[in-house]
Swiss-Prot record:
Family affiliation: Belongs to the gyrovirus capsid protein family.
MF terms in GO: DNA binding
GO BP terms: endocytosis involved in viral entry into host cell; viral penetration into host nucleus; virion attachment to host cell
Protein source organism: Chicken anemia virus (isolate Australia) (CAV)
Cellular component, GO, one term: host cell nucleus
Protein's name in the database: Capsid protein
Primary role: Self-assembles to form the virion icosahedral capsid with a T=1 symmetry. This very small capsid (25 nm in diameter) allows the virus to be very stable in the environment and resistant to some disinfectants, including detergents. Essential for the initial attachment to host receptors. After attachment, the virus is endocytosed and traffics to the nucleus. The capsid protein binds and transports the viral genome and Rep across the nuclear envelope.
Coiled-coil zones: none
Length: 449
């Protein structure tokens, strides 16, 4: 039986399939009842191209014994990329390197904790940084200093990508941790996050709100398109932890209904939300191809899906993204912002609570905090952003591009995002005094404490 609700002015609602539906009342214009014709509906039209929540139902799972709510609030600056001194770039192509005004904001607890890290010159403020500098210490060796930091990396290695949105964010967390700076003066790893929340082993996402505003013009027409998607539309989970080599972090896509032939079994499952733009391993003609083998006419390579995959302005617009015009092209008001709201886990399976620290873990290490044991870095939603322009390269599909500049003492942001997020931690273990006393009395049976 569907739940029903009534609001003033005769508006009726019914809860079905995970959301409230507005019931259309019959017209009273005629003597006899006539049902209103179901004409074109904007919501159904948009969902035909991009459904942010494809199906939802709730599963009855036991609630935790104790919970704690944590909140994040802050601002994210979407800035243009920088390049290190051009004279040291290998190959001498620095003068011909361009970047696109695209961004990707992943909603996961790991990156929100990174966004609220300590605001010091060795952490992230102003980002990206080429490496971690020596913060304190009197000896020449970095390993003998506190905190243990390293010198900057080689200037030919990229320091960050637009997917690392937390580097350009100022986020506040409530409740605060007064010992966070002394315990974790550097960037927190998954092991540090597990120790920070060692008393909790479950977490869930309640709600996240985004308000995006375009701040920079690019020609006479330069709106910023933003689209909130469930889960990971174009990305995959990072199975290689703390790897500085980006190529080792890439994964081979396994997409359904493409007709591709995979020569190896990957770690990813097929995702129905992906557009089959490219098969994983298309058969191609090589020196060992037998005569008479039917192959495709177009030569293509393996479909690599990485964290650095973004959507163009035209793609986001075709999927029904909102537009935000910068000041000068439209008067600034509340409607100048693109409003996005994500609620729940965004999981059609209905999994509400996720594992923060696995049960039975006496010593929290990176192996315990890595997938699939811990789901701390699970993406619940992803916000894709791209700025359009009336003059762009053809293969960029209307996306604004720019020439990479050398680092200066100020950042050039083309969009600003206001964020509010609510999460909840849980613990299913029974925190009863008799259980604790029994554990203390039996823990050292047969051993010497």
């Amino acid at each position: 039986m569907a739940r029903r609700a009534r609001r003033p002015r005769g508006r009726f609602y019914a809860f079905r399939r995970g959301r409230w539906h507005h019931l259309k009342r019959l017209r009273r214009r005629y003597k006899f009842r006539h049902r209103r014709r179901q004409r074109y509906r904007r919501r159904a039209f948009r969902k035909a191209f991009h459904n942010p929540r494809p199906g939802t139902y709730s599963v009855r799972l036991p609630n935790p014994q104790s919970t704690m709510t944590i909140r994040f609030q802050g601002v994210i600056f979407l800035t243009e990329g920088l390049i290190l001194p051009k004279n040291s770039t290998a190959g001498g192509y620095a003068d011909h390197m361009y970047g696109a005004r695209v961004a990707k904001i992943s909603v996961n607890l790991k990156e929100f904790l990174l966004a609220s890290m300590n605001l010091t010159y060795v952490s992230k403020i102003g980002g990206p940084i080429a490496g971690e500098l020596i913060a304190d210490g009197s000896k020449s060796q970095a390993a003998e200093n506190w905190p243990n930091c390293w010198l900057p990396l080689d200037n030919n290695v990229p320091s960050a990508t637009p997917s690392a949105w937390w580097r350009w964010a100022l986020m506040m967390m409530q409740p605060t941790d007064s010992c966070r700076f002394f315990n974790h003066p550097k960037q927190m790893t998954l092991q540090d996050m597990g120790r920070m929340f060692g008393g909790w082993h479950l977490f869930r996402h309640i709600e996240t709100r985004f308000q995006l505003l375009a701040t920079k013009n690019e020609g006479s027409f330069s709106p910023v398109a933003s689209l909130l998607s469930q889960g990971e539309y174009l990305t995959r989970r990072d199975d290689v932890k703390y790897s500085s080599d980006h190529q080792n972090r890439w994964r081979k896509g396994e997409q359904p209904m493409t007709g591709g032939i995979a020569y190896a079994t990957g770690k990813m499952r097929p995702d129905e939300q992906q557009y089959p733009a490219m098969p994983p391993d298309p058969p191609i003609i090589t020196s060992t191809t037998a005569q008479g083998t039917q192959v495709r006419c177009m030569y293509s390579t393996q479909a690599w899906w990485s964290w650095d995959t973004y959507m163009s302005f035209a793609t986001l617009t075709a999927l029904g993204a909102q537009w935000s015009f910068p000041p000068g092209q439209r008067s600034v008001s509340r409607r100048s912002f693109n409003h996005h709201k994500a609620r729940g886990a965004g999981d059609p399976k209905g999994q509400r609570w996720h594992t923060l620290v696995p049960l039975g873990t006496e010593t929290i290490t990176d192996s315990y905090m890595g997938a699939p044991a811990s789901e701390l870095d699970t993406n619940f939603f992803t916000l894709y952003v791209a700025q359009g322009t009336n003059k762009s390269q053809q293969y960029k599909f209307g996306t604004a591009t720019y020439a990479l500049k050398e680092p200066v003492m100020k950042s050039d942001s083309w969009a600003v995002v206001r964020v509010q997020s609510v999460w909840q931690l849980g613990n299913r273990q029974r925190p009863y005094p008799w259980d604790v006393n029994w554990a203390n009395s039996t823990m050292y049976w047969g051993t010497q404490p």
